[in-house]
Amino acid sequence: MGKIIGIDLGTTNSCVAVLDGGKARVIENAEGDRTTPSIIAFTEDETLVGQPAKRQAVTNPTNTFFAIKRLIGRRFKDDEVQRDVNIMPFKIIQADNGDAWVESRGKKMAPPQVSAEVLKKMKKTAEDFLGEEVTEAVITVPAYFNDAQRQATKDAGRIAGLDVKRIINEPTAAALAYGIDKKQGDNIVAVYDLGGGTFDISIIEIDNNDGDQTFEVLATNGDTHLGGEDFDNRLINYLADEFKKEQGLDLRNDPLAMQRLKEAAEKAKIELSSTNQTEVNLPYITADATGPKHLVVKVTRAKLESLVEDLIQRSLEPLKVALADADLSVSDINEVILVGGQTRMPKVQEAVTNFFGKEPRKDVNPDEAVAVGAAVQAGVLAGDVKDVLLLDVTPLSLGIETMGSVMTKLIEKNTTIPTKASQVFSTADDNQSAVTIHVLQGERKQASANKSLGQFNLEGIEPAPRGMPQIEVTFDIDADGILHVSAKDKKTGKEQKITIKASSGLSDEEVAQMVRDAEAHADEDKKFEELAQARNQADGLVHATKKQVEEAGDALGSDDKAKIEAAIAEVEKAVKGNDKEAIDTATQSLIEASAKLVEIAQAKAQGAQSSAQGSSAEKTADDVVDAEFEEVKDDKK
């Protein structure tokens, strides 16, 4: 059986790890980096992922996608999506089913389809390291992801050719990474996870009992639209406003300028974690009738902190809720772990320290801990790690809509999963022959204020006065946090079941089509690579042949020379096209036409060898020097 890999599919960066000799190991990608930017670019010829995509973003902003995780499993009309529509350089559109999709070069794509490109890169990275095919993975998601977002993440895995064995919450994975080597005593750990696009807080109890470890999540909370991208956007808007004040031009209307501004803002934010002041200097950022314009703005750490102060405060509210849900106070927390790149900001660390009254641990790598934890969970599923039990929770309450548009909860938030709950309901009207089961996720009493996960009908109920029929509704949450619902008429035994797909989401047919597209792309990519190799080989041969023609000089007859030059022209023409066979044929013809050059080169080499031997014999004879000796007599002294 092949290895199960652990993947942290992040908003800004992704990371892959695997159990290697009993230890979780983060794998370096083809560029030699331990994390890969979650950036995907579509050019005319190919799909770029990671650093290569990031490098060309400035020149291709409308086809370069980043922070796609913020759109996954979301509706176009969601407030969070609408906030991003106006600031992203790429096009976010409404799909036919109401989901948020993106568009590149006239092609509409679902976020799972785009995220699948990052997962494919992670899969390939692991395969290159292991030297074998990888088909199974554990993928992490923010703890506060709802059912639709979890489903969409699984879909992305399927499109990438991966069987997703488990979806695991990011803070839980980080706690696994932290606690796996610490076998002494029991600990209550708070994991504060502020990543590129999402924020989670989880309170986790780690019990150690005779070498066996139990990781039990006591409570979780968060905000799936709060992260480093929001911090970047505050700085981007500040820089754009400063430029507008000075030059009277709004850079927000120029995607190219905004992409440069985004890169500069991200760099400045990172620099301000270790220095008190930096300068954002972008020459030729734009131009008007009077000529080119340059952006030069000094930014202090204090200024950045004032721009994002409310975002940091926003992250503290879920901490209070999580502690209350776990029925704990701040003093009950033994350790605080920081996860996610944004936690490197000193002001964030200061806020967390002040809240918990203790310094967070510094021995956990905020960029890699989640992938390491996913690899540990993969080891548990594969049977390679025996003494670890993970008890995760559902982040939001689940229930159905009942009379008066009220949400009636069947499973409360922070219930340990997997779990099952049943409740008996009845009809609202006399002789009602069908009921609609409307499944909801959230904490509000009013049904419409919660997230609708889907609905289905149970039909064929026997006519009876209202309140008489007994309809048993059962909610069953699996270990991935994905919900299965059934409704049963207890009198007739009629039953209707569904696995909740978001009221939108991708159908099985759509996912299957995307898998086929991805496979077709793999063939396309292979063909493109082969074409590039053929072109390189042809170019190299043309260069070498021209050099040989020059070196042959008069030794090459005019007929042969004309033949070679004609063959070179054919190769140069073929290289400009996209027909690999034509390039190969032209290359072969040039090799055959250059046979005379090979003969001349060999003759020259033999001539050089024999002249070298002749000169060495002469040199031996010449080494005998004629000389006259004079007798020196003592009296000459």
Curated annotation (Swiss-Prot):
Induction / repression: By stress conditions e.g. heat shock.
Keywords attached to this entry: ATP-binding, Chaperone, Nucleotide-binding, Phosphoprotein, Stress response
Phosphothreonine PTM sites in chain numbering: 198
Keyword Chaperone applies: yes
Family annotation (InterPro entries): ATPase_NBD (IPR043129), Chaperone_DnaK (IPR012725), Heat_shock_70_CS (IPR018181), HSP70_C_sf (IPR029048), HSP70_peptide-bd_sf (IPR029047), Hsp_70_fam (IPR013126)
Molecular functions (GO terms): ATP binding; ATP-dependent protein folding chaperone; unfolded protein binding
Superkingdom of origin: Bacteria
Residue ranges, compositional bias (Low complexity): 604-617
Pfam families, sorted: HSP70
Residue span of region Disordered: 604-637
Acidic residues compositional bias, start-end: 623-637
UniProt keyword ATP-binding present: yes
NCBIfam families in the cross-refs: PRK00290.1, PRK05183.1, prok_dnaK
Function description: Acts as a chaperone.
Similarity comment: family membership: Belongs to the heat shock protein 70 family.
Name under which the protein is recorded: Chaperone protein DnaK
Gene: dnaK
